Curated annotation (Swiss-Prot):
The gene is fabH. This is Beta-ketoacyl-[acyl-carrier-protein] synthase III. Belongs to the thiolase-like superfamily. FabH family. It is an enzyme of class 2 (transferase). The last Arg residue of the ACP-binding site is essential for the weak association between ACP/AcpP and FabH. Pathway: Lipid metabolism; fatty acid biosynthesis. It comes from Streptococcus equi subsp. zooepidemicus (strain H70). Its EC number is 2.3.1.180. It catalyses: malonyl-[ACP] + acetyl-CoA + H(+) = 3-oxobutanoyl-[ACP] + CO2 + CoA. Pfam families: ACP_syn_III, ACP_syn_III_C.
Length: 324
């Protein structure tokens, strides 16, 4: 059998940093109000670079670290809800920029679960035996879909990208997965809504900014996502103590606090960096993964078990247990 493994990680964020105090200059808020409710202290905001630019930087780092030429790639998947355009896809732009002429490329739209969904799909591509290696990237410029007059959402989000190089392995590294969608609750978190516009329709004005029912999303994370994580740990056959770290979507520190209690695991095993980046949707988990390798918490030598879990718009949620 053919399996897959994560062999390289990388991340990139725009240079412009916006602190909570900076936000207090343009809206009715304060550092204390934001940090006490979310754990977020600052975020990176793109002033020039588009989502594809961030993803390209990550792709270049992944290739440089691996020593592979871009022509050795078989596929590129970019998870994003803030693409440069509806078409061409962000992944296609990455493919062109790095010269990955042998790779097929497509975008994955699953909001804050996007990276986990994309990684699960990439694992299956390699396990099929038809493909040897590819890039899985989460990239967002959420600053362009935020209503900067809406304090309830503007303080939460940031821009950035992270990703992995996935390649074939003789050993199994992806040990368990659980992917979920509940479209019936989709209106709890929306963005990019558009109306019918043609000579034959009577389109109506819609709000295209990101809109969120914060309480509904909070309750969903604590209830449904915690239950799913508990189930996937049982499915994997691992004891909770055998999990070295949990890397969850970086939405809100209060969510992580409550989920740790609900799942029954030590809070210190839940890695976090939302204080530096805010919520970067599909980019949050790969940025956290890359930083954790960079700072030595994760070894990338096959000796650790980690759980990756994303949750957000759709509603979607999904988890993977990976030997890394």
């Amino acid at each position: 059998m053919v399996f897959s493994k994560i062999s390289q990680v990388a991340h990139y964020t725009p240079k412009q940093v916006i602190s909570n105090d900076d936000l207090s200059q343009i809206m009715d808020t304060s550092h204390e109000w934001i940090s006490s409710r979310t754990g977020i202290e600052k975020r990176h905001i793109s002033t020039v670079e588009m989502t594809s630019d961030l993803a390209i930087r990550v792709a270049e780092q992944l290739l440089a670290g691996s020593g592979y030429d871009a022509t050795a790639l078989d596929f590129i998947i970019v998870a994003t809800i803030s693409p440069d355009a509806s078409m061409p896809s962000t992944a296609a732009k990455v493919q062109a920029a790095i010269g990955a002429t042998n790779a097929f490329a497509f975008d994955m739209t699953a909001a804050c679960s996007g990276f986990v969904f994309a990684l699960a799909m990439a694992d299956k591509l390699i396990a099929s035996g038809a493909y040897q290696r590819g890039l899985v990237i989460g990239a967002e410029t959420l600053s362009k879909i935020i209503d900067w007059q809406d304090r309830s959402t503007a303080v939460l989000f940031g821009d950035g990208a992270g990703g992995v190089l996935l390649e074939a392995s003789e050993q199994q590294h992806f040990l368990a997965e659980a992917l979920h969608t509940d479209g019936a609750r989709g209106q709890s978190l929306t963005s990019g809504q558009s109306s019918l516009r043609s000579p034959f329709s009577q389109g109506q004005e819609v709000n295209s900014f990101l809109q969120m029912d914060g309480r509904a999303i909070f309750d969903f994370a604590i209830r449904d996502v915690s239950r799913s994580i508990t189930a996937i740990i049982e499915q994997s056959g691992l004891a909770k103590e055998e999990l070295d770290y949990l890397l969850l979507h970086q939405a809100n520190r209060r969510i992580l606090d409550k989920m740790a209690k609900k799942i029954g695991m030590p809070r210190e095993k839940f890695l976090e960096n939302m204080m530096h980046y805010g919520n970067t949707s599909a980019a949050s988990i790969p940025i956290l993964l890359s930083e954790s390798v960079q700072n030595g918490q994760l070894k990338l030598d096959g000796s650790q078990h980690i759980l990756l879990s994303g949750f957000g718009g759709g509603l979607t949620w999904g988890s993977l247990i990976v030997k890394i």
